[in-house]
Amino acid sequence: MKDRKLLNIELGRISADEYRNSRPESGVVLVLDNIRSAHNVGSAFRTADAFGVDKVYLGGICPVPPSPELRKVALGAEEVVPFEHVSDVVSLVKRLQADGYKVIAVEQTVHSVKLDAFRREPSARYALVFGNEVEGVQQAVVDACDCALEIPQQGTKHSLNVSVSIGVTLWGIR
């Protein structure tokens, strides 16, 4: 059987305004801890849109919309997904915990849970923290989080681009 790609009209896309006004809460927010690349932040927005993430927190040196480089990758997702810039990620973690979120550092730690072993609690709200391209999640932020989640990997690098990690993690916890 020959297959074909769907046409845009068949995808049932709605306008950004319609989506903003009707989107259900997913119970998941992203926290970007000092991610320096506008391309990675733009990709995070686009992936957050695809998975229905409630909000993206941009910590420290993260590029913040409006940014032409960020927009080039986000393709307008930064206009649909709510965001907030914060200077202190540790304070944000504590605020999110006080608001009832389970805050999870996506990082390789001594006690990290493998993504394939993670079981999402149906009514729980999660804040997923992703770190800088070189240093990862700051140790002080890891210390403040409730736990850590690790993407099992093979090979020699034992790391993924942060934008890839975001997509893998959001798919894994769905």
Label every model-predicted segment:
Residues M1-R174:
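Post-transcriptional modification and biogenesis factors for structured RNAs
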